[in-house]
From Swiss-Prot:
The lineage of its organism: Bacteria, Bacillati, Mycoplasmatota, Mollicutes, Acholeplasmatales. This is Putative septation protein SpoVG. Keywords: Cell cycle, Cell division, Septation. It holds the Pfam family SpoVG. Belongs to the SpoVG family. Could be involved in septation. One of its GO terms (biological process) is division septum assembly. It comes from the Bacteria.
Length: 99
């Protein structure tokens, strides 16, 4: 499956959570709430999950093989790094005195 879109939202704060991402495949299927986490060995990607009644976490959606996982991780990490290197410009909505 071809990745056709990746969106990343940076999270500022003191937790290890650095951002949240969504990834779209073939303009037909999207996976939301992929977490970007700062671990002891750098950034890692955590697929969306839910907590079970026993306190364990189970992925809601995840890649079936390591090749697909690598593609997803590379796309998200690249987009996240691009966001860090080129933060979006804040728009100025102040009144223009020339009006």
């Amino acid at each position: 499956m071809k990745v056709t879109d990746v969106k990343v939202r940076k999270i500022n704060g003191e937790s290890r959570l650095r951002g949240v991402s969504s990834i779209t495949f073939e303009n037909q299927f999207v996976v939301n709430d992929i977490r970007i986490i700062e671990g002891e060995r750098g950034i890692f990607i955590a697929m969306p999950s839910r907590k079970t009644s026993k306190g364990n976490f189970r992925d809601i959606a995840h890649p079936i093989n390591s090749e697909t996982r690598q593609i997803i991780e590379n796309c998200i990490k690249t987009k996240y790094q691009d966001l860090l290197d080129n933060p979006p410009q804040e728009e100025d909505f102040s009144q223009n005195s020339e009006n």
